[in-house]
Structure formats: C-alpha cells, structure tokens
Amino acid sequence: MTLRVVARIKAKPDKVEEVREALTDLVAPTRSECGCVVYELLQNTDDPTDFTFVEEWESEAALADHAASDHIQATREKLKGIVEEAPDIRTYTLID
C-alpha cells in the first residue's frame, strides 16, 4: 500500500527565496531514494510564502527512511529561523 504525503511549509515573508532554494535542493536527492514514487514541490500562486510538497511513497519504511535521511536533516537545520512555523506534514492512504 502506498502512502501519500502533503507537507506544507510557510516561509517568513522576507525569506521566501532562501526557503525556496532550501526546498528545491531536496527534490533531486529525494526522487532518487528507494521507495519514492512521486515528489513534487509546489509554490502557491496567490501567496509566495506558501510551499507544498506532494509525495507518494511505496511503504511506511520508505517514508521513515526519507524522514531520517541526511538531506532532510540538513534542510530542517537550514529552515530554522526562516519559516513561520514547523512544517504541517500529513500522511494519507488512497481511498479511490
């Protein structure tokens, strides 16, 4: 059973480009992770401080490995002080 993840990150208004760069740097290494099916980064067209990842993972284990990866840990450090709040990360299963 695959898992879907929606992760929302809110940049501080004066830190949008720094947040965008930090998040963009996650895309390539994450897409190459074992178990990653989809990993897309979106930016809200009406609110440029609002970023969202839409993800699909083959298993809970693959998602857990992703969360523990070096590039995720490094990005968490980079985001300290430049985001409004902790990321809102929600995990879903597909119903239909």
Model-derived features: where do they sit?
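Absolute protein N-terminus
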Residues: M1-T2, D96
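Short, well-ordered beta-strand segments in beta-rich or mixed alpha/beta enzyme
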Residues: L3-I9, E40-A67
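Alpha-helical and His/Cys-centered functional microenvironments
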Residues: R8, D70, L94
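Beta-strand elements of well-folded, non-transmembrane domains
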Residues: A11-P13
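Short amphipathic alpha-helical segments
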Residues: K15-V37, H71-A74
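Glycine-rich beta-strand-turn "strand-cap" elements at beta-sheet edges
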Residues: L41-T49, E77-D96
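Long, charge-enriched, surface-exposed interaction segments in small proteins/subunits
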Residues: E56, A67-E84
